[in-house]
């Protein structure tokens, strides 16, 4: 083994519970790395815009890294198709997404399109 990384994440205050839901099968996972003390600045604006954003595609979960690589914020959204994702993204500016905040811009962004495992309660 050349490298290994372990992380523990806690749900953001507005993150929904992990319950059985059929909101996929495509999921977009985004992870942002911020400077220290910036993540708390985005949480309020995110929570305020969440209902409008959920109308475009449901939030699977939002998480803050607690152990390992810290100062990271991850959010996962469900899409019925890749076309659904494209259509939702085209409407983001009309709802003010992403929300404006006093946080400094992220230092790094990672984006992945994934599909649920067979055993996942969220499909």
Predicted segments, located by residue:
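An amphipathic, aromatic/His-enriched active-site/gating alpha helix that lines ligand/cofactor pockets
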Residues: 1-9, 45-60, 69, 78-117
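A short, structured loop/turn motif at beta-sheet edges
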Residues: 17, 35-37, 83
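Short hydrophobic/aromatic beta-strand micro-patches
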Residues: 33, 76-78
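Short, surface-exposed ligand-recognition loops at beta-strand->loop->(often short) alpha-helix junctions
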Residues: 33-43
């Amino acid at each position: 083994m050349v490298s290994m990384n372990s992380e523990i994440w806690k749900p953001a205050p507005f993150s929904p519970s992990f319950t059985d839901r059929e909101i996929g099968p495509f999921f977009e996972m985004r992870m942002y790395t911020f400077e220290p003390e910036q993540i708390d600045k985005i949480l309020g604006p995110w929570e305020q815009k969440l209902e409008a954003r959920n109308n475009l595609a449901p939030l699977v979960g939002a998480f803050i890294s607690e152990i390992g690589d810290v100062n990271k914020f991850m959010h996962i959204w469900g899409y019925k198709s890749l076309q659904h994702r494209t259509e939702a993204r085209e409407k983001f500016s009309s709802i003010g997404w992403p929300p404006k905040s006093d946080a400094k811009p992220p230092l790094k962004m990672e984006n992945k399109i994934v599909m649920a495992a067979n055993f996942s309660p969220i499909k």
